């Protein structure tokens, strides 16, 4: 009889752990993030747009990005941020495809965009460090070459910086493309991609939003992040000996420089949805 009771107790503890841990780690922060978003929407202070938006540098690491680079640059060109105030540094990370040809084509398509092609040694952190030293302007923004900016993303992020001098570093909200999700032919594939979209929403619009309110963001999104130039250049920059360079630079800003890191929830960056359920599981 005691053995049976022990087994029943073990099963109760086991299943309670599977229920309680997700409740604490996922559901409560998600609900908190929703409340925070609602509060900002209804009662948030309206951010004032400066008379003239400052000059910024947009750093885009490029590695075999021939298929996605044109769409990425088109989203920058079509954004609401003044093109004359944007400096774009495309840092080639030893690509082996036609990325450079796409860059040359985009120079012809968008002659009003100031674009520069740099070549760096292998490794994303080395590419980012190289571009940081070549940057101009008040703010430095990183985006990946395999996604596209929502048209107001750059403007919203810079306005947040300009309205709050205590914000020194921000991460944008990364979501999967809803258009590509709805264009998915198979029903199963569409369901998988919608689940992935909800996962991204939970991670950024709920989880990161909750962390931002508590000032507890310790990892920037490598796909879309921004810094005050005066702050990032005082760090040890990106560590070339680790694959967690985004976390490393975030810790430098938070712990060594005692600066704050926030989420800009209305600065959106869209990436391609997952190709299959198997890849979603791996991710």
Provide a role label for each language-model segment.
Residues 74-85:
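Short, acidic, metal-binding catalytic loop of nucleotide-sugar glycosyltransferases
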Residues 110, 126-127, 151-236, 240:
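Long helical/loop segments within the catalytic core of UDP-sugar-dependent glycosyltransferases
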Residues 92-101, 120-122:
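A conserved acidic beta->alpha catalytic loop
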Residues 118-135, 156:
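Glycine-rich, basic loop-to-helix element that forms the pyrophosphate-binding segment
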Residues 140:
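Short aromatic/hydrophobic "clamp" motif used to bind/position activated sugar donors
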Residues 1-52, 208:
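N-terminal membrane-anchoring/stem segments of glycan-assembly enzymes
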Residues 241, 251-270:
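Catalytic donor-sugar/metal-binding loop of nucleotide-sugar-dependent glycosyltransferases
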Residues 54-57, 87, 248:
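Cell-envelope/extracellular polymer assembly enzymes that use nucleotide-activated donors
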């Amino acid at each position: 009889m005691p053995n049976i009771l022990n087994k029943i107790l073990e099963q109760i503890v086991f299943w309670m752990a599977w229920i309680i841990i997700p409740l604490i780690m996922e559901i409560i922060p998600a609900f908190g993030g929703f409340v925070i978003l609602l509060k900002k929407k209804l009662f948030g202070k309206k951010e004032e747009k400066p008379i003239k938006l400052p000059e910024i540098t947009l750093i885009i690491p490029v590695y075999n990005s021939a298929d996605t680079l044109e769409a990425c640059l088109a989203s920058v060109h079509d954004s609401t941020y003044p093109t004359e105030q944007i400096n774009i540094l495309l840092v080639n990370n030893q690509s082996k495809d036609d990325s450079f040809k796409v860059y040359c084509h985009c120079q012809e398509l968008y002659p009003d965009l100031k674009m520069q092609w740099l070549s760096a040694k292998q490794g994303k952190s080395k590419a980012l460090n190289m571009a940081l030293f070549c940057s101009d302007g008040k703010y430095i923004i990183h985006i990946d070459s395999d996604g596209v900016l929502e048209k107001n993303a750059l403007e919203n992020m810079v306005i947040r910086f300009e309205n709050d001098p205590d914000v020194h570093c921000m991460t944008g909200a990364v979501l999967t493309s809803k258009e590509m999700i709805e264009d998915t032919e198979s029903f199963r594939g569409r369901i998988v991609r919608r689940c992935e979209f909800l996962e991204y929403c939970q991670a950024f619009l709920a989880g990161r939003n909750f962390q931002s309110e508590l000032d507890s963001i310790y990892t920037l999104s490598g796909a879309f992040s921004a810094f005050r130039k005066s702050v990032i250049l005082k760090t040890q920059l990106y560590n070339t000996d680790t694959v967690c360079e985004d976390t490393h630079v975030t810790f430098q800003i938070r712990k060594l420089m005692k600066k704050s890191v926030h989420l800009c929830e209305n600065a959106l960056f869209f990436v391609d949805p997952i190709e299959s359920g198997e890849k979603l599981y791996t991710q």
